[in-house]
Amino acid sequence: CHCIAVREKLLAMKETLGIPEFGGPWFCTTLRPGEVTVNMTRTAGNAIDNRNFTAAECRLREDVFKIARIFKENFEEFKNSYVTTVAVHAGIRETRRIKGVHTITAEEYVNAYKYPDSISRGAHPIDIHVAAGAEQSVTFLKKAAYVPYRALIAEDFSNLLVAGRCISADKTSFASLRVQASCMGVGQAAGVAAAQCIKAGVTVQKADIHNLIEELKKLGAII
């Protein structure tokens, strides 16, 4: 859950206590009584530069323990808290994407435009985080959006199919498509398409869309 009261108190103390950049915070319970996960740390960086990304990860790990101390000292609910686990690596919201045969636009995504080659759906809010500060823009979708097969095909390559955060989408639609559920749906479609193309002896540009969609439906994909 997103705790607004905690957020407001943190923002009020940010300058005085030197609180690192943060988002949320969002809290989730686990299977262990009294344990919560805290989704909060945030930093800007260039994740395609290994040195820059390494520096960002080091900074974030330091921030975890700074924030843990601030919670322990300033929130009654956390007075006996301690850190048990830190994420293996930093989550990356955005790096490079392909220029596909079709690029999903914000207008198409928000209005749930159904393409003739739709192979997956996206329902996560359009969630844009600022590079610096605690703000974010959130737009909830009225209807689950669609993802076309063409957005998985790289425009300038004869036989390249991608999935996950690399698909062809503008910045706004990508802010929803980047999450795990969307990546799983697109990944399933890409895998089935690749298998069918190999069996048929054709490139990914020549995939039989009807057969692809029918097979995905048989597998229980949400289309």
Residue ranges, per PLM feature:
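Flavin (FAD/FMN)-binding glycine-rich loop and adjacent Rossmann-like elements that form
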Residues: C1-I223
